[in-house]
Amino acid sequence: MTTVKFKYKGEEKQVDTSKIKKVWRVGKMISFTYDEGGGKTGRGAVSEKDAPKELLQMLEKQKK
C-alpha cells in the first residue's frame, strides 16, 4: 500500500493508506482520520497537490 506523509502539530508523520478510515476535503486540503492502534484515532491533512492518488480515490469513493 501507499503511505501518506504529513505534518501534524509540527511533527513529521506518515500513515499507510490501508489504515485511513475517513477522508474529506477542506478547501485545497485533504483531511483524514486513521487508526493509530490501541483504539486510538489519529488525524492528518495534506495539500491536494501532495496527496497520493490512492487518497484522492478514497475521497471520490466516499462522495458517492
Curated annotation (Swiss-Prot):
Classification via InterPro entries: Chromo-like_dom_sf, DNA-bd_7a-e_arc
GO molecular function, one term: DNA binding
SUPFAM superfamilies: Chromo domain-like
Keyword hit for Ion transport: no
Subcellular location per the Swiss-Prot or TrEMBL entry: Cytoplasm
Taxonomic superkingdom: Archaea
A GO cellular component annotation in the UniProt record: cytoplasm
Record key words, sorted: Cytoplasm, DNA-binding
Principal cellular location given in the protein's record: cytoplasm
Temperature-dependent activity: Hyperthermostable.
pH dependence per the entry: Highly stable from pH 0 to pH 12.
Subunit structure: Monomer.
Protein function: Can constrain negative DNA supercoils. May be involved in maintaining the integrity of the genome at high temperature.
Alphabetical list of NCBIfam families matching this protein: Sul7d
Protein family: Belongs to the 7 kDa DNA-binding/endoribonuclease P2 family.
Protein name (database record): DNA-binding protein 7b
Species annotation: Saccharolobus islandicus (strain HVE10/4) (Sulfolobus islandicus)
